[in-house]
């Protein structure tokens, strides 16, 4: 199964390892991509909780374009609040399709800051995934 990605013109620096990771997930889950136009990947660490912290959950969405799969958004979630009032909220939101990026507590991020933060986040995320911290579910439409 071939899963081409179209990365030209992306506002953030996508490492070749990230599409490789997503291809591996699709292959492992034996997904049939023929009739799908979107894929949503949910990466969850079973040990992550409001009390103990841990590796944040991540949602990543791809859209099928004319020249391959394109990144729509990548969102990193974290628990905010204390005790029973803690709720899972967006901490980092990289909207690649519209070049708008957000960090909780800071608000919208200018391009240079977004690129630097994304490069660091992406490196950590790929490392955590390769180390097996996540269970992954994929849904498609």
Task: Indicate where each model-derived feature is located.
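N-terminal domain-onset segments
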Residues: 1-46, 132-140
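Amphipathic, interaction-prone secondary-structure segments
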Residues: 30-69
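Surface-exposed beta-strand edges and flanking loops
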Residues: 43-45, 62-64, 76, 96-98, ...
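Short non-domain terminal segments
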Residues: 3, 39-41, 69, 75, ...
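Generic secondary-structure transition motif, activating predominantly at the C-termini of alpha-helices
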Residues: 22, 26-30, 34, 78, ...
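An exposed acidic His-Trp-rich patch
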Residues: 66-116
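Low-complexity intrinsically disordered segments
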Residues: 100-141
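Short, flexible coil/linker segments at or flanking structured domains
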Residues: 6, 29-31, 46-50, 82-84, ...
């Amino acid at each position: 199964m071939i899963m081409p990605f179209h990365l030209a013109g992306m506002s953030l620096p996508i490492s070749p390892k990230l599409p490789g990771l997503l291809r591996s997930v699709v292959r492992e889950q034996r997904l049939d991509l023929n009739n799908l136009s979107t894929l949503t990947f949910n990466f969850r660490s079973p040990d992550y909780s409001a009390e103990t912290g841990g590796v944040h959950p991540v949602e990543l969405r791809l859209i099928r374009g004319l020249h391959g799969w394109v990144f729509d958004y990548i969102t990193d979630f974290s628990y905010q609040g204390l005790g029973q009032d803690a709720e899972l909220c967006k901490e980092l939101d990289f909207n690649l399709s519209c070049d708008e990026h957000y960090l909780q507590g800071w608000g919208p991020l200018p391009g240079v800051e977004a690129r630097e933060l994304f490069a660091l986040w992406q490196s950590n995320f790929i490392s955590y995934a390769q180390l097996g911290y996540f269970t992954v579910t994929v849904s498609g439409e």
